[in-house]
A protein has these predicted regions:
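Glycine-rich phosphate/pyrophosphate-handling loop used in enzymes and phosphotransfer proteins
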Residues: 1-123
């Protein structure tokens, strides 16, 4: 019951909040308006390297490159749900665990958080 309430509350807040990229339209897709969501530099293929499939959601181009950099280095945590949902939308094969890449203790002290640990917890 509490989970349902939280989901409804989140949807309500999202429907009146501005898009995280353009700030103009209302959020419709994981914190973005439909125009910004459609204009993300989607990568619609798998990359094969050394007989392994590598899944990648986007080309590292604007605006996704800015989203990643500001989330990672400028503590803009409002992007955490967007990045987690983009990864979830990859339709990953059945996995048993998601393991964030560890960062050095110095980087952790500098940033104050492990950005991928936050995303892994959301996923």
């Amino acid at each position: 019951m509490l989970q349902l309430f939280n989901q409804l509350l989140h949807k309500g807040i999202q429907s009146i909040s501005p898009c995280l990229l353009c700030g103009i339209d209302r959020q419709q897709y994981h914190s973005l308006c439909s125009d910004c969501w459609e204009q993300l530099p989607w990568l619609k293929q798998h990359i094969e390297r050394h007989e392994q499939n590598i899944l990648c959601a986007h080309h590292y181009l604007f605006p996704i490159d800015r989203v990643i950099l500001t989330y990672k280095y400028e503590q803009q945590l409002q992007y955490q749900n967007l990045l987690a949902q983009i990864l979830l939308d990859l339709r990953l094969p059945k996995v048993q665990a998601i393991v964030p890449m560890p960062i050095s203790t110095q980087r952790l002290a500098d940033r104050g958080y492990n950005q991928m640990l936050i995303i892994a917890k959301i996923m």
